[in-house]
Amino acid sequence: MSRPSLTRFLIEEQHAGRIDAELRQLITIVSRACKRISIAVSKGALGGVLGDAGTGNVQGEAQKKLDVLSNDILLEANAWGGHLAACASEEMDHSQPVPEQYPSGDFLLLFDPLDGSSNIDVNVSVGTIFSVLRAPKGTEKPGDEHFLQPGTQQVAAGYCIYGPSTMLVLTLGHGTHAFTLEREEGSFLLTQANMRVPDETAEYAINMSNQRHWEPAMQAYVGDLLAGKDGARGKDFNMRWIASMVADVHRILTRGGIFIYPWDKKDPSKPGKLRLMYEANPMSMLVEQAGGAATTGRERILDIQPTQLHQRVPVFLGSKNEVAAATRYHLDADKA
């Protein structure tokens, strides 16, 4: 029996009344853009796209050539379809409405065009993260303020990971599903329906080099993980860290674990490292739809009311019992 394609999956979701035709077509366009990005990434040094672009983004981060190229691919692919009202990206200071010569649709698209791009030059898996919101009714020219919706308002979220194989992981609010790109055919085929994150885990992903900058609750939590079966947790834990959120979260969706990027004192003015709107929110929706959990260490990420397009948050996501344990350390410390 042949595997269902992404196209068939989306049409069946539409027939079941879970999505409309416009959202189906938007996801199809995003998936096509991801195929183009996958081709560019896979060429590596042969494509002349490695290295810095010589520019910076709104976060003050140096842009890689592939950051800029991936951003341009997503913008161009979504400009003319008629399903989108505006886009927002990690690589752009402000949101961008669709060009006036094209019809405007009902949706807002946010994306990190190439997450983990600092790993590109060393050939580590990277990916595209995206989130879809509905434009508020009556909005003719959406601005940044129209994107400021809590993650619970997402109608779709996903990422495309460019690794040994290219995979699109998608949720439309009814489970999390993985599609693998069949390169000869050029189609994404369903390879894992209804992904499930185990409730329990003994694996965590964190950048331990920042340990000295963590708050006491975070120090205590990781200290107990490191103590293993001789400590308060009573079992041994393994640590993994790829420094590519897409790659780390993909591992967690596949076999469980907890991904952590906490607040730290290196720059106390920043509430976290990862961006809420196009990193934390879509990844949180994917993980929750797979039975996991996602918090800031104190509150559910999807409940946060954003105040800025490029707002940052701490992130704890993955196996729900371990996320609950990490959150408990922080809340108990707040009460002390």
Curated annotation (Swiss-Prot):
Annotated positions binding Mg(2+) 2: D112, D115, E279
Coiled coil: none
Cofactor(s) for this UniProt protein: Mg(2+)
Keywords: Carbohydrate metabolism, Cytoplasm, Hydrolase, Magnesium, Metal-binding
InterPro entries: FBPase_C_dom, FBPase_class-1, FBPase_N, FBPtase
Binding annotation for Mg(2+) 1: E90, D112, L114
Entry note: cofactor: Binds 2 magnesium ions per subunit.
Enzyme Commission designation: 3.1.3.11
Pathway: Carbohydrate biosynthesis; gluconeogenesis
Keyword Cytoplasm: yes
Entry's Gene Ontology BP terms: fructose 1,6-bisphosphate metabolic process; fructose 6-phosphate metabolic process; fructose metabolic process; gluconeogenesis; sucrose biosynthetic process
Known catalytic reactions: beta-D-fructose 1,6-bisphosphate + H2O = beta-D-fructose 6-phosphate + phosphate
GO molecular function, one term: magnesium ion binding
Binding site for substrate: D115, G116, S117, S118, N207, K273
Record CDD domains: FBPase
GO CC term, one of those recorded: cytosol
Compartment(s): Cytoplasm
NCBIfam families for the chain: PRK09293.1-3, PRK09293.1-4
UniProt record similarity statement: Belongs to the FBPase class 1 family.
Complex and partners: Homotetramer.
Record's protein name: Fructose-1,6-bisphosphatase class 1
Natural source organism: Xanthomonas oryzae pv. oryzae (strain KACC10331 / KXO85)
Lineage: Bacteria, Pseudomonadati, Pseudomonadota, Gammaproteobacteria, Lysobacterales
Gene field: fbp
